[in-house]
Amino acid sequence: MQLQFLGTGAGQPSKARNVSSLVLKLLEEINEVWMFDCGEGTQHQILETTIKPRKISKIFITHLHGDHIFGLPGFLSSRSFQANEEQTDIEIYGPKGIKNFVMSSLRVSGSRLPYRIDFHEFDENSLGKILETDKFTVYADKLDHTIFCVGYRIMQKDLEGTLDADKLRAAGVPFGPLFGKVKNGQDIVLEGGTKIIAADYISAPRPGKTITILGDTRKTDSSVRLAVAADVLVHEATYGKGDEKMARKHGHSTNMQAAEVAKEAGVKQLLLNHVSARFLSKDISVMRQDASTVFENVHVVKDLEEVEI
């Protein structure tokens, strides 16, 4: 499971950072890739990666500001041009209005897609659990921005315990169908009458990962709720230390406020993105150092960077 950042800038693209988009790679878990926001130029950023557009099965939009959605029509159109590849349907989750934006753009441009788009829109009264599969659950909650904006909490369900094959062989169980039965939790009896209790050879279930991805926001209690005990928190840092008044005025956060959220939520790792073009490379180092005085395990991500979860 990995996060790859396609755009880490704020508001408008710069030479160093494109506007907002990232993907959660779940190839080993479910052979899918989930995208979060799709700012202008996202499809071009994908060309610099190994991501296959047809593998992107779900897109989660945090809010309807242009730097988070203007790349959608182009990406969806280009996704249909994957020659010799199977066309796969796609689901888009986001605030009410995202369907109208996408369909209007496709209609006006005369774009015809060979696959289906399923929209899942929500407003302030329909948040909470927005998706559940056999392996993942996704929650959304309202943040505090200048327009309706949400954050997402992606929870992987507990993983099955692993079979201790060496211990099982030592108990006299031959490799083959009996192994499969024990792996599936079924007790067996060997030819000599020895009873094998499956639970004795399977480790306890392993807790799944939790990833929190926030849209644009001021520091707010819902950010903490979404991030409680998360393995990774992706939080915006449009502004730096000392810019709290400016951040509040424009509906954003500073690096220090993001670190406070991470500390209060008890997350394992904080990844800062949505960085203003005002910050040069040397400023990024200071931004990280300042935030680390509040929450130690913090990193400011850059475009195309991939983080293992």
Swiss-Prot record:
Its cofactor is Zn(2+). Gene3D superfamilies: Ribonuclease Z/Hydroxyacylglutathione hydrolase-like. Binds 2 Zn(2+) ions. Zn(2+) 2 binds at D67, H68, D216, H274. InterPro entries: Metallo-B-lactamas, RibonucZ/Hydroxyglut_hydro, RNase_Z/BN. Its EC number is 3.1.26.11. It comes from the Bacteria. Zinc phosphodiesterase, which displays some tRNA 3'-processing endonuclease activity. Probably involved in tRNA maturation, by removing a 3'-trailer from precursor tRNA. This is Ribonuclease Z. It comes from Streptococcus gordonii (strain Challis / ATCC 35105 / BCRC 15272 / CH1 / DL1 / V288). The lineage of its organism: Bacteria, Bacillati, Bacillota, Bacilli, Lactobacillales.
